[in-house]
Swiss-Prot record:
UniProt cross-references to Pfam families, sorted A to Z: Ribosomal_L21p
Native organism: Sodalis glossinidius (strain morsitans)
InterPro entries on file: bL21-like, bL21-like_sf, Ribosomal_bL21, Ribosomal_bL21_CS
Keywords (A to Z) from UniProt: Ribonucleoprotein, Ribosomal protein, RNA-binding, rRNA-binding
Keyword rRNA-binding recorded: yes
One cellular component (GO) term of this entry: ribonucleoprotein complex
Coiled coil region boundaries: none
Protein name as it appears in the record: Large ribosomal subunit protein bL21
UniProt keyword Ribosomal protein, yes or no: yes
Family note: Belongs to the bacterial ribosomal protein bL21 family.
């Protein structure tokens, strides 16, 4: 059984017991979160596709950890002018473990 959920403007294919890295959620570690923006649920041959979301579809998950991703360096420069700009960015994320998929 698997499902496709939307979180943080991205779509993720998940199944029970899987740990997924999502955009940062303001929920404490160890808490339970429910996702109701479920776009598809597949259980063998029984497939439910929403338009855009499945009515009554719900995914429950437990927040495992919060953190920041690897650093990405942004560099801007103009040739022959000795103009150089450096900027770094680290995106926040939340790891969640899928505990249940329901329709």
């Amino acid at each position: 059984m698997y499902a496709v959920l939307q979180s943080g403007g991205k779509q993720h294919r998940v199944s029970e017991g899987q740990t997924v890295r999502l955009e940062k959620l303001d929920i404490a570690t160890g808490e339970t979160v429910e996702f109701d923006q479920v776009m598809m649920i597949a259980n063998g041959d029984d497939i439910q596709i929403g338009g855009p979301f499945v009515t009554g579809g719900k995914i429950t998950a437990e927040v495992v950890a919060h953190g920041r991703g690897d650093k990405v360096m942004i560099v801007k420069f103009r040739r022959r002018k000795y103009f150089r700009k450096h900027q770094g960015h680290r995106q926040w994320f939340t790891d969640v473990k899928i505990t249940g998929i329901g329709a």
